[in-house]
């Protein structure tokens, strides 16, 4: 797998929540769902190349999957990784700008 293909597989989706929106407004931090095996360097490179912004820092957390029941059977949702990407001063990335129009 080439490096370009790997960068495309690192970022899965932006994570939109109330906390993520507040972080974006206050501290210029964007939250992404990322591949479970991705590291901070890969995440920073992927964001910088795909969105053409300068990344200041990356923090990651593995979110544990919830246990769910369906009748008498129990199952478990998959674990997933969340990355908080802080952009450099003056950089901006807005996912919901076009949705308001």
UniProtKB/Swiss-Prot annotation:
Pfam families (UniProt xref): Ribosomal_L23 (PF00276)
The entry's keywords: Ribonucleoprotein, Ribosomal protein, RNA-binding, rRNA-binding
Gene3D superfamilies registered for this protein in UniProt: 3.30.70.330
Annotated GO biological process: translation
Protein's job: One of the early assembly proteins it binds 23S rRNA. One of the proteins that surrounds the polypeptide exit tunnel on the outside of the ribosome. Forms the main docking site for trigger factor binding to the ribosome.
NCBIfam families: PRK05738.1-1, PRK05738.1-3, PRK05738.2-4
Protein name as it appears in the record: Large ribosomal subunit protein uL23
Species the sequence originates in: Mannheimia succiniciproducens (strain KCTC 0769BP / MBEL55E)
